[in-house]
Amino acid sequence: MQAALPHLKETKGNIINFASGAGIQGHETQATYAAAKEAIRGISRVAANEWGRFGINVNIISPLADSPGVQAWAKAQPEYYEAVRSKIPLGRFGDIEQDIGRVAVFLASDDSQYITGQTIMVDGGSLMLH
C-alpha cells in the first residue's frame, strides 16, 4: 500500500483489502491465519485514518465465499463443510463474483466515497451469530 500512496494521492483512489471472520471470531487451530488477517484489518484502519485527508478510502471485505479452497475443503471434509454451511443464515457460501465482487465494485465506486476504515462482512450473516 505504501508503494501505491503517491499514485493514490493523485487519483484519490480506493484501497480494498481482504480479511477473514477467522480473526474476528477466533476460530480454534487458526491462530496464525487469524493473526495475519487481523493485521490486514489493523493496517487498513491506520491507512484509512492517515490517508483520508488525501481523499483515499481504505476498506476491508471479510468474505465467506465458495472459493476453490472452500471446495477442496468440502471434498475433504464434507460433514464439517455441511455443518458450517447449515449455520449460515442465508444457507450458502457466497458466490465470488455475484456476492463478493459486487461489494468490491461498490467500494471502488464513487457511491462509497463516504465510507472508509470499515470491515464489510460479506458472509451471509454468519458473523452476527457469534
Regions found by a protein language model. Give the residues of each.
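Short C-terminal tail/terminal secondary-structure segment
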Residues: 25, 116-130
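C-terminal helical subdomain
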Residues: 53, 60-61, 79-111, 115, ...
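Active-site loop immediately N-terminal to the catalytic Tyr-X3-Lys motif
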Residues: 12, 25-31, 53-54, 91, ...
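Residue(s) in the substrate-gating loop at a strand-loop-helix junction
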Residues: 20
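Short-chain dehydrogenase/reductase
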Residues: 29-38, 94
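Conserved Rossmann-fold SDR core element
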Residues: 41-44, 51-67, 71, 115-122
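Active-site helix of classical SDR
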Residues: 1, 36, 44
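Amphipathic alpha-helical dimer-interface segment in Rossmann-like NAD(P)H-dependent oxidoreductases
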Residues: 1-10, 48-49, 109
